[in-house]
Curated annotation (Swiss-Prot):
InterPro entries: C2_dom, C2_domain_sf, PDZ, PDZ_sf, Rho-GAP_regulator, Rho_GTPase_activation_prot, RhoGAP_dom
Function of the molecule: Probable GTPase activator for the Rho-type GTPases by converting them to an inactive GDP-bound state. Regulates the localization and assembly of presynaptic components during presynaptic development and is required for specifying the identity of axons during initial polarity acquisition. In these roles it is thought to act cell autonomously downstream of syg-1 and syg-2 and upstream of syd-2, possibly as a positive regulator of the latter. Required for the control of movement, egg-laying and the correct localization of elks-1.
Name of the protein: Rho GTPase-activating protein syd-1
GO cellular component: neuron projection; presynaptic membrane; synapse; synaptic membrane
Length: 987
């Protein structure tokens, strides 16, 4: 009884498309999802997740036919043949010892095995709960010599089937399922067949040699030894000549100093006799666990022997120098960030232009800069200790009474402790993919005061790059000409978890390490009163030095509204970006200051700006959600969520559904036309086809504050904090009216969008463009009472796919609801067509005439006003006039359903007035007569254009039916009637 009820419920789901093909009113269709997880066409066998679209979204280059989310996949879902369904049900209702024994959960066994040479044919029985996932991934072909057939790709995480040993393994081919041949079926059909029955009989085939090869290869991967590779990393001379530290850190009083003293003691004992050295080299536990060293050609590097007495003597002298105290020999430069392919290391061997043929070592992090005894003879004595060079080479530091080195040329002092151990001049200089959240230098005026931030989202996180320094590292501004750049930064911990600055450096040592430096011994390239800003490195530029003090809020606000501000420093050589005024005062959107900030924005007086809202096109790309959680009451019902975007409390866009297996990666883009927008809200809802959707998370973003740093024309990535928990990664961009309505011509002459109307209708031999006519007719065919029409935005990805097909085949493109279920995609294409015309449908000259007509129109004489407006419209070019009549008739039809779609004349005019009137016609503006009291035509004034369009719509006649033969306006709006263009006179 339970099995038959489940089968009926499943049949109802698959036949109805999860509750019907139409979404609830006011909600666009969710995006389409393919049933493939990887490029190898893997497929998960979780039927519930598959039916509720839990797999990866459709690629932008997929065919248009896959945009229909309400239909089952081709060949699957509700289109399984009845014969196949009967075979599945017959085997499912058969008797089995596993079902009779009452085993709960998933169970599997091998019923028969028939070896045929290298191939083995097995009959496998699997008993599972209805709808239970097998945790199995399928693919088409084996990835080697076959491209057809259904093969097991891999097991999922915590797969129950993987615990049954030799029943089924990756690489096996599935021949039949419940006596149904599946070799020539699609992966979607196979997944559906596996999800329906409770009892499965699978006939599989595998190769013994291939299965053994797969098992052995996986075992070898799990037992990989630790190997340290040499990596060549070429660096510029400017980097190698720049000092790491003019005052090296003294670690005598820390755990690092203790370890260095232990190392020194061991080395002194090792020099007493060769027997002790040999014994120490063979019995030291460090040697047993030390990583094997290989060079760039994968050849092992042997440990050289130290047998010469000269080397022993030199090493003994080096280790026993009276001036070589522990506080000096334990000086270790702070760690640096290596490339992304190797571990983070401390560099000890980067002498510029110096190469040595002596073998190189890798030392543990706790070791000192004392070199081994066998290579001391091959280098000068001054190069062994950079602190004991001649005064001719090193400047004298009057503050410390010692010689300071600004350019370390010692080939031993840049030796890597883990991975890259070649000189820096031989390594690659490609460090563009490193973390941007490691400690950087800043002048420390007070005592120890490290501010740890956890609200900075690194760009590398969005790119999928891992950086262990991005977890807990303070922010310091770095000089642009030093080795401590944005790409090469230091790590405060030694790699062990839980260590902080207090465990590594004392207070004096940390101030010495993080303090200012100078190539001449005291200061760096910036004097004590100057520094480089970390915000200036956002665009990879190097700006002029500027002060560290933030100017008054009034001065900054005046500079934003256009008041001249005298520069306090010479202008930079590099041309400033739009955010130069903020860079000049070291203003960052992620403020790290102790001064109190206003809640209005990131240290900026937004009230003094010249704009208070945004009007233009808002580009919103919803990337993914992090830390999202479905409420406890909803966990048993659904695991899918979608995001809703509101602008000024108005519903404007909605994403498709996504699951936790997809890590809630929506990755959908929307182009939203906004008028005086100030706030955008993001709501995350749980989705279920039958139950009410529940609000799970919400967040808000003030648009003006998001774009004020880039002066309103740029895009940024935000990690928006949601309530009660989680983050939403969004990229938001904005283009103002000047950038949107440039009215440029499409260079593709055979295209449809962005082509002159006269050229387009002449080529198509039609009165109106084919694309515009078909799109309007399709919307009217579906009904103009759709809530959210022309307000909700369709997905940009779907819109691009449909637009590409219309460009290539305007007449043959399928626009029915079965192919394009989202009406918002079609509505957005209509607006794009009008927006991208090289010239507006209503030119500025005609607009000026309409303004004069509005000034002399009589309030109660509709017929006279209509006659006047139609005479003005007749002055347009024939192609523009016919297209305008088509659009105005459509808008009049839309207004007839205003109680249902919520579009009032004012709201509809704000949407379409910019599309019909706006342009950048600043060369020959229309000037009205001197006697008129009307103002001049403003080509980008949305209020003026909206009032003109409202006047036209208020007197526009209703659509007439050409079959009636009457020229009188119809009393009702005819949706299916043929358009009869009204033209009462000619100019």
């Amino acid at each position: 009884m339970l099995i038959s009820t489940s089968l009926k419920f499943l049949t109802m789901l698959t036949s109805n498309g999860f509750g019907g093909t139409n979404p609830p009113k006011g909600m666009p269709y969710p995006p389409t999802y393919l049933y493939t997880e990887e490029p190898q066409n893997e497929c998960c066998c979780c039927w519930l997740c598959r039916l509720l679209c839990c797999c990866s979204p459709v690629d932008q280059t997929a065919s248009r036919s896959r945009m229909n989310a309400s239909q089952p996949p081709p060949g699957g879902g509700g289109r399984l043949p009845d014969e196949v369904f009967r075979k599945i049900t017959a085997v499912d209702q058969g008797q089995s010892t596993l079902t009779q024994s009452g085993i709960q959960g998933l169970s599997a066994r091998t019923l028969s095995s028939e070896p045929r040479g290298d191939l083995v044919f097995q009959l496998v029985e699997i008993i599972k709960k209805p709808g239970q996932s097998l945790g199995l991934y399928l693919r088409e072909g084996n990835g080697k010599d076959r491209s057809d057939g259904v093969f097991v790709s891999r097991f999922g995480d915590n797969s129950e089937l993987a615990k049954y040993g030799e029943v089924m393994r990756p690489g096996d081919e599935i021949l039949t399922i419940n006596n149904v041949e599946v070799s020539m079926m699609s992966i979607d059909d196979v997944v559906l067949i596996l999800s329906i029955p409770r009892r499965l009989l699978l006939r599989i085939r595998y190769s013994k040699s291939m299965r053994h090869e797969i098992i052995s290869s996986r075992s070898r991967e799990s037992e990989r030894p630790v190997v340290v590779f040499h990596k060549y990393d070429d660096r510029r001379d400017s980097e190698t000549n720049a000092p790491i530290l003019s005052q090296p850190t003294s670690t005598a009083n820390t755990w690092l100093g203790k370890k260095s003293r232990q190392q020194m003691e061991e080395m002194r004992n090792a020099t007493t006799s060769s027997t002790l050295r040999t014994h120490a080299s063979t019995s030291s536990p460090r040697n047993h666990f030390a990583p094997r060293l290989v060079n760039g050609h994968s050849h092992s590097i042997g440990v050289p022997s130290a047998s010469t007495t000269s080397h022993d003597h030199q090493y003994q002298r080096f280790a026993s120098e009276p001036s070589d105290s522990v506080s000096r020999t334990a000086r270790v430069p702070p760690p640096r960030l290596a490339s992304a392919t190797v571990r983070r290391t401390e560099s000890f061997n980067s002498a510029p232009g110096v190469s040595t043929s002596a073998p190189m070592y890798t030392l543990p992090r706790s070791s000192t800069a004392v070199p081994p005894p066998d290579i001391l003879g091959s280098i000068p004595y001054s190069a062994r200790d950079p602190l004991m060079r001649s005064s001719a080479d090193l400047p004298y530091d009057p503050m410390t009474g010692r010689l300071s080195s600004s350019v370390p040329t010692d080939p031993l002092l840049s030796r890597s402790l883990c991975s890259p151990i070649l000189p820096r001049t031989l390594r690659q200089a490609n460090d563009s993919n490193k973390s941007n959240s490691l400690p950087r230098r800043r002048i420390m005026t007070g005592g120890r005061n490290v501010k740890w931030r956890n609200d900075v989202v690194s760009t590398s996180d969005l790119c999928g790059e891992e950086s262990d320094g991005a977890i807990s590292a303070p922010e310091y501004s770095s000089p642009p000409f030093s080795r401590l750049t944005q790409q090469q930064q230091f790590r405060l911990s030694n790699g062990s978890p839980g260590r902080t600055v207090n465990d590594i450096f004392s207070a004096a040592e940390y101030r010495n390490w993080a303090g200012p430096y100078d190539p001449r011994g005291m200061y760096g390239p910036f004097p004590p009163g100057q520094r480089a800003t970390r915000w200036s490195h956002t665009y990879g530029e190097q700006r002029a030095p500027r002060t560290s003090s933030l100017p008054g809020r009034t001065v900054l606000a005046q500079s934003l509204v256009g008041s001249p501000v005298l520069p306090r420093h010479p202008p930079p050589i590099v041309q400033d970006r739009p955010s130069a005024v903020f860079d000049r005062y070291h203003v960052s959107p992620l403020m790290n200051r102790r001064a109190p900030l206003r809640a209005a924005g990131p240290g900026i007086n937004v009230d003094r700006l010249s704009v208070s809202s945004l009007t233009g096109i808002l580009y919103v790309h919803i990337v993914e959600g992090r830390g999202l959680k479905i409420p406890e009451k909803q966990k048993g019902l659904t695991e899918e969520m979608y995001c809703v975007l509101e602008v000024d409390e108005q519903h404007r866009a909605r994403t498709g559904v996504s699951t936790i297996e997809q890590k809630f990666k929506w990755r959908e883009t929307f182009h939203i036309d906004v008028v005086n927008a100030t706030v955008s809200n993001f709501f995350v809802y749980s989705w279920h086809p039958q139950f009410r959707h529940k609000l799970c998370h919400k967040g808000s973003l003030k648009l003006l504050e998001a774009f004020v740093v880039d002066q309103l024309n740029d895009d940024r990535v935000f990690a928006l904090n949601l309530e009660p928990r989680g983050q939403l990664i969004v990229r938001i961009g904005f283009h103002d009216l000047q950038a949107v309505f440039r009215r440029t011509v499409n260079p593709r002459l055979n295209g449809v969008f962005g082509i002159s109307l006269s050229r387009l209708v002449q080529r198509e031999r039609r009165d109106t463009p084919i694309v515009l006519t078909r799109l309007i007719q399709e919307i009217e065919k579906r009904g103009v009472d759709y809530s959210g029409l022309y307000v909700l935005c369709g997905s940009v990805e779907k819109k691009k796919m449909l637009r590409a097909e219309l460009e290539s085949n305007p007449l043959g493109t399928e626009l029915a609801a079965e192919s394009i279920p989202d009406t918002n995609v079609i509505a957005c294409l209509i607006k794009d067509f009008l927006r991208e015309l090289p010239e507006p449908l209503i030119s500025p000259q005609i607009h000026g005439m309409l303004l004069e007509a509005a000034s002399v129109a009589l309030p109660n004489d509709v017929q006279t006003n209509r006659h006047l407006v139609l005479k003005i419209i007749d002055c347009l070019q024939l192609s523009a006039k016919n297209c305008l009549l088509l659009v105005l008739d459509h808008l009049s039809t839309v207004l007839c359903s205003s109680p249902h779609n919520g579009l009032t004349p004012t709201r509809l005019s704000l949407i379409f007035a910019p599309l019909l009137f706006f342009c950048l016609d600043t060369f020959s503006p229309y000037t009205i007569s001197p006697t008129s009291k009307m103002a001049a035509v403003r080509t980008l004034d949305i209020n003026q254009a909206s009032s003109s369009l409202q006047m036209i719509l208020s007197i526009w006649p209703s659509r007439v039916n050409s079959e009636s033969g009457s020229d009188s306006p119809a009393t009702t709006c005819q949706k299916g009637g043929v358009i009869a263009y009204v033209s009462e006179s000619q100019c």
